């Protein structure tokens, strides 16, 4: 049986994710109290091979030990995958302003920002046990649906998906990154007038980097690092591994490095995805 637990802060996209899972053939239950999880799974294990449930802040036990107890009472051989979806505070504030929905903690008469921050604190026990995370801050509904679909389908054939993501440090760290590498020490084509307005996807910029020994060494050592540890991640209960490489603005160095790593690991029959965060939003 495949069991996916979907959690995250209100407004982050849990409902969208659960709807996607339902379309993918999962038996879905929304807002199930975590204490009822073992009972539900035992009741339907003969009838359904794929189950997804969503858990929000109202369904969590008061003590984190109760969460562990609920997971330990699942049928033998059922290893839950926990998808935790979140967005930054500003994005969530904007979404609540647009929909005019009440936050689940609004009954405590907290201002919205304080309610969101309190919710984050309360969800920490399940967030810490997440096997995959999604930061939906910059994702449209379609993009969120697409990422959930890609990762679930990738998990169906038991293959770990490696996501190579480029980003700009000036715009903040990616929240869903498992490893972050800093490419700001590398030569920067931004200072070449003819390359400034191009990106790491352009041929002229790629030629510039191929002529830089430090860039070649950087890629070589990252590849060796991932070659060493990838087998260990493949044996764990994970759907994906996000490798984020950042430079100042996320246009040149990080884009080139991420592309190069993706191409190299694709040649090794590893399932990869590439995302260039700033090319979508600041390019």
Swiss-Prot record:
InterPro entries: P-loop_NTPase, RapZ-like, RapZ-like_N, RapZ_C. Pfam families: PapZ_C (PF22740), RapZ-like_N (PF03668). One of its GO terms (molecular function) is GTP binding. Transmembrane segments: none annotated. GTP binds at residues 56-59. Signal peptide: none annotated. ATP binds at residues 8-15. Keywords: ATP-binding, GTP-binding, Nucleotide-binding. Displays ATPase and GTPase activities. PANTHER family: RNASE ADAPTER PROTEIN RAPZ. Belongs to the RapZ-like family. This is Nucleotide-binding protein IL0393.
């Amino acid at each position: 049986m495949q069991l996916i637990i979907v959690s995250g802060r209100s407004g982050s996209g849990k409902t969208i994710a659960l709807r996607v899972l339902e379309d993918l053939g999962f038996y879905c239950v929304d807002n199930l109290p975590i204490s009822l999880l073992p009972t539900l799974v035992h009741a339907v294990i003969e009838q359904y091979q794929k189950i997804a449930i969503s858990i929000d802040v109202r369904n969590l036990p008061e003590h984190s030990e109760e969460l562990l107890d609920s997971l330990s009472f699942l049928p033998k051989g059922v290893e839950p995958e926990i998808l935790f979806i979140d967005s930054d505070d500003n994005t969530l504030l904007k979404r609540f302003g647009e929909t005019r929905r009440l936050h689940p903690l609004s009954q405590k008469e907290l201002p919205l920002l304080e309610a969101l921050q309190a919710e984050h604190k309360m969800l920490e026990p399940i967030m810490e046990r997440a096997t995959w995370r999604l930061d939906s801050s910059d994702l449209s509904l379609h993009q969120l649906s697409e990422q959930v679909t890609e990762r679930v389908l990738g998990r169906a054939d038991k293959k770990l998906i490696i996501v190579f993501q480029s980003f700009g440090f000036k715009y903040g760290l990616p929240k869903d990154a498992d490893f972050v590498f800093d490419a700001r020490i590398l030569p920067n084509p931004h200072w070449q007038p003819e390359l400034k307005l191009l990106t790491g996807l352009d041929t002229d910029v790629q030629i510039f980097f191929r002529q830089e020994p430090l860039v070649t060494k950087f890629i070589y050592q990252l590849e060796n690092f991932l070659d060493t540890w990838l087998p260990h991640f493949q044996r764990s209960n994970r759907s994906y591994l996000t490798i984020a490489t950042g430079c100042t603005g996320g246009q040149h160095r990080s884009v080139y490095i991420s592309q190069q790593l993706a191409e190299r690991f694709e040649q090794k029959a590893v399932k990869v995805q590439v995302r260039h965060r700033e090319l979508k939003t600041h390019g």
